Amino acid sequence: MSWRPTHSVRNAPYSMRDNYAQGVDVYYKKVGGTYRNLHFRGLRLLLLQCLSHFWDHDEKFKSHGLHVIDLACGSGEVSETVIEWEHLGRELGIHGGAFKVRKEISIRSIPPELPPFELIATDPFTLEAYTNRIGKPCLTLNFQDIADEKLPPSSAEDGIYDLVICSFALHLLTEPSKLFSTCYALSVQCRWLLVLGPHKKPELKPEWGWDAWNIDTWCPLGYGISHDYVLERVHARFFKSRNLIDG
C-alpha cells in the first residue's frame, strides 16, 4: 500500500474572516492557483470515516460503485481523500487483512469486481490548484450554475450521483434564496449530501430537498436536531434527498 496523500499547505497568513472581508469571490480569484485548506488533516480523517459509514449502510454503493461530486473542490482535498479511500479499499479487497488510519478509523474492503468510482469535481476559482494536485482538471461550475441545473449527469444508468460532498463552502451561500435553489437542484440529481465545514452552518430545511441523517445510527432526524460528526474541529453532516425516494 504505497499510495500516500499530499499534505502540503500554502495559503494566505490571515484568518478566513479577514480574507473574506474583501469579498469571497475576490479572495478566491486571488489565491485560486495556490489555495490549500488549512483543515486538511481533520477533513481527511473525518471523510475517511464518513466514507466507511456510507459503505456500511448504502447497498447501491456496494453494488454499482460510487458516483460522487466534489462540489466547490478547492485544491482537491476531498477528491484526494476519496481516491485514497478507494485505493486502500481495493488493496484490502485483493490482499485481505485490515487497515486502520488510526484506532477509530477503519478502511473497508472493496471487492475487485466493483467498477471504478466516478469522481466529478467543480470549482469556479481553483482549476489550477486542483489540476496540480489531482492531475486532472475540474469543471468550473459555481453555485449558481448548479442551481441552474448545469451539472452534467453521472455515468450511472439513471444519471444520478450517489454522493455530493461540499467541503468548507456551503456556508458561504448566505442568501437563503440562493442556498435553497442550489440545494434543491442537487436534491434531484444526488441521493446523498455530505457537508463538511468548520461549524454547524448552514441549516438545511426539509423543503429544500434534504432530510438530516444521523451518521452513527443511519436514521433520519427531525429538522433542527443536531447531527454533527466532529473530528479535530471539522464538522460532518449527512443529508438524504427527499426527491429521490429510492435513495
Curated annotation (Swiss-Prot):
This is Uncharacterized protein C17A5.05c. It comes from Schizosaccharomyces pombe (strain 972 / ATCC 24843) (Fission yeast). GO terms for molecular function: methyltransferase activity. Gene3D superfamilies: Vaccinia Virus protein VP39. InterPro entries: SAM-dependent_MTases_sf. One of its GO terms (cellular component) is cytosol.
